[in-house]
């Protein structure tokens, strides 16, 4: 069911004879991003097309960009089966950020393997930069984006600016998965200069890594 959005996006682009060069989605646990890229990734794996996939995660919970590829519990209670994934450790406690859906300690096993195999990229972005992009998007498009989606918008804007600087023309597809009308307090904090960016130290990460079980396979 998660790939429905990807199938719909592909069908809409096919209708107008378009193929995306870059496909961007926010990444917390992976369902959002995985659903969007699944149909396109299939084409890439079959050698039918060459897409560039970018996963965007919060800098305060950087499972892809700073996590370890290891077997770990999927839950903090260590009850569920373990899975091999990029993880910060089941005991990792992320800082409170407005994108609550992106605060999971691990990442989808499927996406983790794709990233590990070099089939997709990942980047981590700070909260204030995400809100800056969200406000720009709202003023231009008239849509106030959801907290998670703002991360994809940040990367999409950055890629568009890069195209403008290099003179390249690229089709960029990103996932906008909801609106942020229940998060107006966060926008108020951002505009009042009260937004805080959480920067993880290596020591913070090591505390989380200590909870990863030692599995020799």
Positions of predicted regions on the chain:
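A glycine-rich, Thr/Ser-enriched phosphate-binding loop motif common to dinucleotide/cofactor-binding enzymes
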Residues: 1-8, 146-151
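Active-site/ligand-binding loops adjacent to catalytic centers
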Residues: 3-5, 16-17, 42-50, 55-143, ...
């Amino acid at each position: 069911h998660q790939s429905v959005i990807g199938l719909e996006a592909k069908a809409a682009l096919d209708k107008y004879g378009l193929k995306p060069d870059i496909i961007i989605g926010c990444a917390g646990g992976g369902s959002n991003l995985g659903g969007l890229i699944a149909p396109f990734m299939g084409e890439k794996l079959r050698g039918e097309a060459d897409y560039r996939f970018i996963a965007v995660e919060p800098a305060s919970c950087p499972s892809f960009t700073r996590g370890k590829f290891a077997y770990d519990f999927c839950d903090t209670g260590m009850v569920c089966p373990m899975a091999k994934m990029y993880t910060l450790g089941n005991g990792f406690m992320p800082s409170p950020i407005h994108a609550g859906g992106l605060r999971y300690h691990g990442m989808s096993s499927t996406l983790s393997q794709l990233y590990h195999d070099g089939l997709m990229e990942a980047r981590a972005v700070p909260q204030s930069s995400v809100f800056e992009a969200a406000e720009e998007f709202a003023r231009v498009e008239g849509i106030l984006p959801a907290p998670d989606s703002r991360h994809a918008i940040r990367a999409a804007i950055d890629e568009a600016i890069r195209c403008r600087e290099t003179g390249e023309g690229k089709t960029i597809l990103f996932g906008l998965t909801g609106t942020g009308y229940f998060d107006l307090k966060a926008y108020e904090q951002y505009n009042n200069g009260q937004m805080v960016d959480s920067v993880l130290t290596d020591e913070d990460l090591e505390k989380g890594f200590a909870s990863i079980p030692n599995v020799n396979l």
